[in-house]
Amino acid sequence: MRRTLLRLLPVLAPGLAHAQDHPTVWLRVRNNSQEVFEHVWQGLPRTRSDVDLGPLRPGQTSRWHAVPATLAHYRKTRIQLAQRQLTDVTDTSFPQGRATLEPGRYTFAYTLEGDALRLTVIPEAGTTAPDR
């Protein structure tokens, strides 16, 4: 029975097997603005690594989600506001000026400055990765 379950694991839980083989970045989004984010999406739609995070009220933080630790999978965040949609292309906001994120956990905190999004990337060193 145990051998059968081990052989079936890649079929039953392909994401779990994939996550163990590749470095992972855990992300969440925080609304640090005074305006409601009516909808938030993050990721790369063409590779099915995009995540629908739903609405975020001011001060609210989304759930954690995991993506491969490759820039393309966490480079874009789209935020729907009451009258417009904004897209943030994340290329220069990483800790210590790095071009990509190291595997780990991060909060993407967004504020609005005029008609633009401002991102602060917060490494979450003391947290543990939540269950998927």
Q: Where do the language-model regions lie?
A:
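Intrinsically disordered, low-complexity segments enriched in small/polar residues
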Residues: 20-63, 67, 76-132
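Extracellular Ig-like/FN3 beta-sandwich strand-entry sites
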Residues: 72-74
